[in-house]
């Protein structure tokens, strides 16, 4: 049907006086964004979602429906996929983008301001902790284990048969 390849052509025309020249901001060239052939998935994150009618509904050679049924079902599939996608994106895209932005901003903030300083602090303190742990081991644990070992080494068992 070709509906999945059609792109919406949206253009915004403004007079030069509509721009506020007093703000000191440089605006991007509108011609740069007027390209309707823009690739919205440059890293191919969702290449697995490019399904056609033949990928979902397939009739073997031995069982074919009427040609009109096949054509109408193909048209209905493409139209419903196109319309439902547009409908769902109108109502879900903006709220989900907002929530994803909040989530990623929160995770970035936690990573930058809490997790990485904590990790760096631990890595910075570890040599001191290692030195203290070695001293504690040499002063307390090693003599304790040595004395327990000597105590158990003097234990002997003798078996007698009576």
Swiss-Prot record:
Cytoplasmic face of the membrane: 1-86, 108-162
Compartment(s) of residence: Nucleus; Cytoplasm; Golgi apparatus membrane; Cell membrane
One Gene Ontology MF term: molecular adaptor activity
Modification Phosphotyrosine, positions: 19, 27
Oligomer and partners: Monomer or homodimer. Interacts with CAV1; the interaction forms a stable heterooligomeric complex that is required for targeting to lipid rafts and for caveolae formation. Tyrosine phosphorylated forms do not form heterooligomers with the Tyr-19-phosphorylated form existing as a monomer or dimer, and the Tyr-27-form as a monomer only. Interacts (tyrosine phosphorylated form) with the SH2 domain-containing proteins, RASA1, NCK1 and SRC. Interacts (tyrosine phosphorylated form) with INSR, the interaction (Tyr-27-phosphorylated form) is increased on insulin stimulation.
PANTHER family, per database record: CAVEOLIN (PTHR10844), CAVEOLIN-2 (PTHR10844:SF3)
Purpose of the protein: May act as a scaffolding protein within caveolar membranes. Interacts directly with G-protein alpha subunits and can functionally regulate their activity. Acts as an accessory protein in conjunction with CAV1 in targeting to lipid rafts and driving caveolae formation. The Ser-36 phosphorylated form has a role in modulating mitosis in endothelial cells. Positive regulator of cellular mitogenesis of the MAPK signaling pathway. Required for the insulin-stimulated nuclear translocation and activation of MAPK1 and STAT3, and the subsequent regulation of cell cycle progression.
Residues that bear Phosphoserine: 20, 23, 36
InterPro entries xrefs: Caveolin (IPR001612)
Sequence ranges marked intramembrane in UniProt: 87-107
Pfam families: Caveolin
GO-annotated biological processes: caveola assembly; endoplasmic reticulum organization; insulin receptor signaling pathway; mitochondrion organization; negative regulation of endothelial cell proliferation; positive regulation of dopamine receptor signaling pathway; regulation of cytosolic calcium ion concentration; skeletal muscle fiber development
Modification note: Phosphorylated on serine and tyrosine residues. CAV1 promotes phosphorylation on Ser-23 which then targets the complex to the plasma membrane, lipid rafts and caveolae. Phosphorylation on Ser-36 appears to modulate mitosis in endothelial cells. Phosphorylation on both Tyr-19 and Tyr-27 is required for insulin-induced 'Ser-727' phosphorylation of STAT3 and its activation. Phosphorylation on Tyr-19 is required for insulin-induced phosphorylation of MAPK1 and DNA binding of STAT3. Tyrosine phosphorylation is induced by both EGF and insulin (By. similarity).
Major subcellular site: nucleus
Organism (species): Plecturocebus moloch (Dusky titi monkey)
Gene transcribed to yield this protein: CAV2
Membrane disposition: Peripheral membrane protein
Membership in a protein family: Belongs to the caveolin family.
The protein's name: Caveolin-2
CC per GO annotation: caveola; cytoplasmic vesicle; focal adhesion; Golgi membrane; nucleus; perinuclear region of cytoplasm; plasma membrane raft; sarcolemma
Keywords, comma-separated and alphabetical: Cell membrane, Cytoplasm, Golgi apparatus, Membrane, Nucleus, Phosphoprotein
């Amino acid at each position: 049907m070709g509906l999945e390849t059609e792109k919406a052509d949206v253009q915004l025309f403004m007079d030069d006086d509509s721009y506020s020249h007093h703000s000191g901001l440089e605006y991007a060239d509108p011609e740069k964004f007027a390209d309707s052939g823009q690739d919205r998935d440059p890293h191919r994150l969702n290449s697995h979602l490019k399904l056609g009618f033949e990928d979902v509904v397939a009739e073997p050679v031995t069982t074919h429906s009427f040609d009109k049924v096949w054509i109408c079902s193909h048209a209905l599939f493409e139209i419903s996929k196109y319309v439902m996608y547009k409908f769902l994106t109108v109502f879900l895209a903006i709220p989900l983008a907002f929530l994803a932005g909040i989530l990623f901003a929160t995770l970035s903030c936690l990573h930058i301001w809490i997790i990485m300083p904590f990790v760096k602090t631990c890595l910075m303190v570890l040599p001191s902790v290692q030195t203290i742990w070695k001293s504690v081991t040499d002063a307390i644990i090693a003599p304790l284990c040595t004395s327990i070992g000597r105590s158990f080494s003097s234990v002997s068992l003798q078996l007698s048969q009576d």
